[in-house]
Amino acid sequence: MEISFRATGSSAEWYGSRFQVDMVRTVEHDNVENEMNMVELSMDPFWQGTTMYNESVLMVSHAGELPEANLLFAPIDILSVKSARLDQEYLENVDWVLEGGKLQLTPNSRIPYLSTDELYYSNYIEGVTIPMVNGGAVLYQEGSYFHDRQIVITYTHAANAWEGPVPQLADNTLTSTFSKLRNGEPLTIVLYGDSIADGSNGSNFVSAPPYLPSWGEMVAQTLEDHYGSHITFLNQSVGGTASQWGAAQAANRVAAHNPDLVIVAFGMNDGSGTGVGDGVSPSVFKNNILSIINTVRATNPNAEFVLVGTTLPNSETIFLDQQPYYFTQLQSIANTMTGVAAANMTVVHSELLEHKTFIDMTGNNVNHPNDFLSRWYAQFIVGMLKDTAFVPTQAANIRRIYSFETGVQGWGVGENVNSVNAVTSIANWPFGPQQGSYALEAQFPTQAADTWRTVSVIPEHPLDLSGAGHFYYYINSYGGSGGSGYETRIRLYSNSHVFESTSSMQADYWNRIVADIGSWAYKHEVTKIEISFRATGNSADWYGSRFQIDNVGYRTN
């Protein structure tokens, strides 16, 4: 390790002087480069506009040639090339060049890549490869192996470049769901499927930056942000399962939660079978999906459904069999049953594979999507559910108590906080308030990273939250604690009685925190509110940093 120092702008002699270094240590990267609101940008529809945000590729060297990769659209201007972790940016003509519409690495590039010799094997090795259709084997890895080697490119392109399917608003089909959303009413969504629905190999799943939420979580968050409805999202998916298991478990895993909307996403494992051409037939698959619908509607006749056609496995492997034939069955169900819509991710993936390689979009090189392909899932389903012509106002059941638009509104320092201020901008992502023009920022001194830091308010008159079902607030913070994560805590006081709830959160992002206070017996007289923040997994000193809160309120029952 070397640390160097010099003056600039003068080559004259500098008579003996000094410089100092102190506290040299490693810090776990926690996505301090999270670009604005990561989920919001990730949900910008790929099929619209003229800018592609963070399209993933994995650079591959064929027969010793310089590694290269295709982009989905013909690029006009490359805006950035970064690691898929978003913790490293690569430079044009230093690390990469654009040649004939392809991204190509320079001889001394810092960008990781794989050679065909590393991707293909003559024999199957358990836990390392997957057998190929015509003999030999292809590299297979779980965890963050492929994510750590992929890069993402942001670039401009011509309008209307996407030639695949686009989602159609399903408001005439999912009438009950849209009625609740447009009226700002609570909505319960259950996602039910296999490992793809569970988020396997996504960056958040494998605990790697940028920790993008699973596609189901992004769907729920986007709808909640757009409509103002309180959405209860339950992911009942289990990796390694198929539709027969889904039919058998639907009563306990889905119907018991009385969902308003069920997103059903099986098919990958059905289609593969045991890898010897014994995938589940399309007719049996259809009957299993019908069984799930009928089981849920036996207890909740008004439940509505989005049936998701699976993406495809690696076509070089024995995993590809019946998957391409399932969506026709899902569409036939949607055509004949009320309150059922179908999302054609099968053809979306097929169109992507006309322009990009499978390894560009995978988390394990067999059947799991990476963050980029997961975003297609989320965007397509949101495209069916988000009415862009609907201009939401504050939902009738939302009561905002503190917006900080007129100052700190009585909030002050609590334990381990030096000062609080109403601010119009912040130094960490996404650089501004969650809503409106101001947020409350708390500054804290150097202290152990896992120490609670607190801001609080004593209302001029006790708050009557008798009609409240949920208390909510938004919180953001600096990163760089060196810990394993972050937590926030809400405490509501009614004199000597205390309600407390703790939630995980991430830095450099406006986290929406919701606490269920529906059954708290003392909510009719709230005399004090405390919101706290800390890092987890590290008790070493964290040198003076900050966190922010905004948009504090509650939802009525």
Residue ranges with predicted function:
Residues 449-471, 481-483, 504-507, 521-525, ...:
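Extracellular/lumenal carbohydrate-interaction signature centered on repeated Trp-anchored short motifs
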Residues 265-269, 294-326:
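Active-site segments of SGNH/GDSL-like serine hydrolases
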Residues 427-451:
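Short carbohydrate-recognition loop motifs
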Residues 161-236, 249-258:
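Serine-esterase "nucleophile elbow" of acetyl-processing enzymes
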Residues 1, 493-527, 538-540:
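Extracellular carbohydrate recognition and processing domains
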Residues 310-392:
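Catalytic His-Asp segment of secreted/periplasmic serine-dependent ester chemistry enzymes
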Residues 27-41, 52, 391-420:
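Extracellular carbohydrate-recognition regions
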